[in-house]
């Protein structure tokens, strides 16, 4: 099964990179050429065959900021707004770059290789996570394997498309998110009577591995902070069942450590780096002697430089961006309904909460089209699609789909259209971002 998934992954990626190669070399935005002229000493290197027809095209949108941070002397951003781009990802890529090779193309090739390895490993981890979720007994084991295979294939066919051909930070969070969810799933137990519990022997995988993975995923991508809802859910369930000591030693401890790490990254480090000289957000301290401000540096950057905030994106000129996100909005909402109302599963209850929270936050507070790029760190919609595809595998049923199967069919057709289109748009430095 793993060999089959590997072959599919190689095939999908080869097609995408071929599309990048075939995309016209003239990009819509000039950021790439300006950056290359700044960082490359030799014009001949920029215009060499493979760089001109392939590698330069991968430096689009956020990749420009990532490669700039990765190739800087100390790995630190030059300007304030560049702190919005994961420092953890920058640090991780720099670990694999030879110290005596300062070529931007060497860094790019290493980053792309790491991107693909993490993307592939995330799909493999997701396969085993899916098997764990859906094989509650021996009779379901074959069904679980089928669901797991389709889920991983759908993950490889993500709507993030062209973004993941470059050096974006998402695959690092995908990997940590899936390992963290898998570790938690292996730790909890839900007996027949529904008494949620966590055995003491699973303290390490729950309170360390899951906590560490969720924390690293969140430090890398801020949307992954929603994974902390797992700890809130478990805390509520253990408290309801009067397992107070376990509630403290498992979810409360894990959640507190995760919160502390985020507090350190989002508030303490920026305050020590920029304040009080910076002014503006630095002056919004809740208390005069404490580093916690009303607005974190990341929130300030998102609001000040990219116009992120409640309903700020709800303008007529952004209607096309909402339309780009509609397929994923629909599939995420319907997957949360499917696993809470139609085929309710206690094991997926917390993930349903997280999925709904993601949709609300992105639709009302963020640039809504990024949902296409970030949604895959949550596998609920992939499980919904895979489950429906397995249950409607009869060709006659697919010819005349009914109800939510029409949604599934539409989404698959949309992916077949969107993935190659978005890959080409990305390589040409064209919207959507």
Curated annotation (Swiss-Prot):
One of its GO terms (biological process) is protein mannosylation. Its EC number is 2.4.1.-. InterPro entries: PIG-V/Gpi18. The keyword NAD does not apply. The chain crosses the membrane at residues 2-22, 110-130, 162-182, 216-236, 244-264, 319-339, 351-371, 410-430. Keywords: Endoplasmic reticulum, Glycoprotein, Glycosyltransferase, GPI-anchor biosynthesis, Membrane, Transferase, Transmembrane, Transmembrane helix. GO terms for cellular component: endoplasmic reticulum; endoplasmic reticulum membrane; glycosylphosphatidylinositol-mannosyltransferase II complex; mannosyltransferase complex; mitochondrion. GO terms for molecular function: alpha-1,6-mannosyltransferase activity; glycolipid mannosyltransferase activity; mannosyltransferase activity. It is found in: Endoplasmic reticulum membrane. Pathway: Glycolipid biosynthesis; glycosylphosphatidylinositol-anchor biosynthesis. It comes from the Eukaryota. The keyword Transmembrane applies. Part of the GPI mannosyltransferase 2 complex composed of GPI18 and PGA1. Mannosyltransferase involved in glycosylphosphatidylinositol-anchor biosynthesis. Responsible for the transfer of the second mannose to the glycosylphosphatidylinositol during GPI precursor assembly. Belongs to the PIGV family. This is GPI mannosyltransferase 2. It comes from Saccharomyces cerevisiae (strain ATCC 204508 / S288c). The gene is GPI18.
């Amino acid at each position: 099964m793993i060999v089959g998934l590997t072959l599919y992954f190689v095939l999908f990626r080869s097609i995408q990179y071929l599309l990048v190669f075939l995309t016209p070399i003239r990009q819509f935005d000039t950021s790439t050429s300006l950056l290359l002229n700044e960082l490359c000493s030799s014009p001949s290197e920029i215009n060499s065959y493979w760089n001109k027809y392939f590698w330069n095209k991968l430096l689009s949108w956020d990749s420009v900021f990532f490669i700039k941070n990765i190739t800087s002397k100390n790995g630190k951003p030059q300007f304030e707004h560049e702190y919005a781009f994961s420092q953890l990802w920058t640090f991780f890529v720099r670990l694999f770059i030879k110290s005596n090779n300062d070529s931007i193309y060497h860094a790019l090739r290493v980053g792309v290789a790491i991107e693909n390895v993490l993307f592939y490993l995330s799909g493999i981890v997701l396969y085993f996570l899916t098997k764990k979720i859906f094989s509650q007994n021996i009779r379901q084991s074959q069904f679980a394997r089928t669901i797991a295979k389709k889920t991983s294939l759908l993950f490889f066919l993500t709507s993030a498309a062209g973004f993941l051909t470059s050096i974006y930070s998402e695959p690092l969070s995908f990997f940590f998110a899936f390992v963290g969810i898998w570790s938690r799933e292996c730790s909890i137990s839900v007996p027949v009577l529904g008494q949620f519990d966590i055995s003491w022997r699973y303290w390490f995988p729950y309170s360390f591995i899951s906590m560490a993975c969720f924390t690293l995923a969140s430090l890398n991508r801020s949307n992954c902070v929603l994974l902390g809802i797992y700890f809130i859910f478990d805390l509520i369930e253990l408290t309801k069942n009067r397992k107070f000591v376990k509630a403290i030693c498992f979810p409360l401890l894990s959640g507190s450590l995760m919160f502390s790490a985020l507090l350190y990254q989002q508030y303490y480090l920026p305050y020590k780096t920029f304040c009080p000289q910076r002014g503006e957000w630095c002056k919004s301290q809740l208390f005069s002697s404490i580093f916690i401000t009303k607005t974190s540096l990341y929130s300030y950057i998102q609001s000040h430089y990219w116009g992120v905030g409640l309903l700020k994106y709800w303008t007529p000129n952004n209607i096309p961006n909402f339309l780009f996100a509609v397929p994923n909005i629909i599939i995420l909402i319907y997957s949360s309904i499917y696993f809470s109302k139609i085929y309710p599963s206690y094991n997926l209850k917390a993930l349903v909460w997280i999925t709904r929270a993601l949709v609300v936050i992105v639709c009302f507070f963020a640039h809504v089209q990024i949902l296409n790029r970030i949604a895959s760190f949550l596998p609920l919609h992939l499980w919904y699609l895979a489950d429906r595809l397995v249950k409607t595998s009869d060709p006659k049923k697919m010819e005349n789909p009914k109800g939510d199967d029409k949604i599934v069919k539409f989404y698959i057709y949309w992916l077949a259209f969107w993935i190659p289109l978005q890959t080409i748009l990305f390589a040409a430095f064209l919207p959507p971002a």
